[in-house]
Amino acid sequence: MFNAKHFFNLGLGFQWLQKRGIGSLKRPYNFPKPVPGPKHKDVLSLFEKKCRSVLDEQSERFKMFHRSQPNRVRPGAVLLVESYSKYPSKDSVNRFAGYLLRIRHRGPKSSILLRNVVMGVGVEYLLPIYSPQIKRIVVLKENGLSKRPRRAYLSYLRQPRFRLPPVESLVRKYIEQNQHKP
C-alpha cells in the first residue's frame, strides 16, 4: 500500500506537491469500467445497410446499381427516372430519360448522372439513387450505344462528334406499353 506521508517525508523535494494538495488523497482513484466495443467489426457498413433498408425497402435500386450484382446497370444504358416534383405531396411526377454517364458509389449517398439532348442543348441530371423523391427508375435499353463502353465514366459523350441517338422513341414506347396495363 502506498503511504503518501512516508513518501513526502523522505526529503526528496516533494514538499511542493503536498502544498498543492496532491499528497492529500487518502485512497486511490477508482476508474470507471471501460465502455464495451461495437459488436460488429465494420460499423460503417452496418450503418449503410440500415440506411439502405429504410430508403430502399425491396432493395431494387441496390440490385440495379451495386458492383456486387452481376446484372447491374452499366454506363451507356438508357434510363427513365420518374420523380415527384413536390416531394411531400406525391401529386405530380416528372420524367427524365437519358444516357447513363456515371455511377458514383458512396453508400447511401450514391448517385447517377444522366445526359440527354433537349431542343439542341445538352442537359445533365445528377440524382441520388436512394432519394425518397424518386418514384422509380426504369431501364429502357441496356446499352444505348453502338458497342459496349469500356469506361466507368463516359465523359467523352459530351463532345459534339459523339452524337447520341434520340431517346424519345424509347420513352414513347414505354409510356404506351404502361398506359394499357391496369
Curated annotation (Swiss-Prot):
Keyword annotations for this protein? Mitochondrion, Ribonucleoprotein, Ribosomal protein, Transit peptide
Q: List localization entries.
A: Mitochondrion
Q: Entry's SUPFAM superfamilies?
A: Translation proteins SH3-like domain
**Transit peptide range?**
1-21
Under the heading InterPro entries, the entry gives: Ribosomal_bL19 (IPR001857), Ribosomal_bL19_sf (IPR038657), Translation_prot_SH3-like_sf (IPR008991)
Gene Ontology CC = mitochondrial large ribosomal subunit; mitochondrion
Keyword Transit peptide on entry: yes
| GO biological processes | mitochondrial translation
Q: Pfam families recorded for this chain?
A: Ribosomal_L19 (PF01245)
GO molecular function annotation: structural constituent of ribosome
Task: Name which cysteines form disulfide bonds.
Answer: none
Major localization listed first in the record, in broad terms: mitochondrion
Quaternary structure, per UniProt, is: Component of the mitochondrial large ribosomal subunit (mt-LSU). Mature yeast 74S mitochondrial ribosomes consist of a small (37S) and a large (54S) subunit. The 37S small subunit contains a 15S ribosomal RNA (15S mt-rRNA) and at least 32 different proteins. The 54S large subunit contains a 21S rRNA (21S mt-rRNA) and at least 45 different proteins.
Query: What is the role of the protein in this entry?
Result: Component of the mitochondrial ribosome (mitoribosome), a dedicated translation machinery responsible for the synthesis of mitochondrial genome-encoded proteins, including at least some of the essential transmembrane subunits of the mitochondrial respiratory chain. The mitoribosomes are attached to the mitochondrial inner membrane and translation products are cotranslationally integrated into the membrane. bL19m is essential for respiration.
Family of this protein: Belongs to the bacterial ribosomal protein bL19 family.
Q: What is this protein called?
A: Large ribosomal subunit protein bL19m
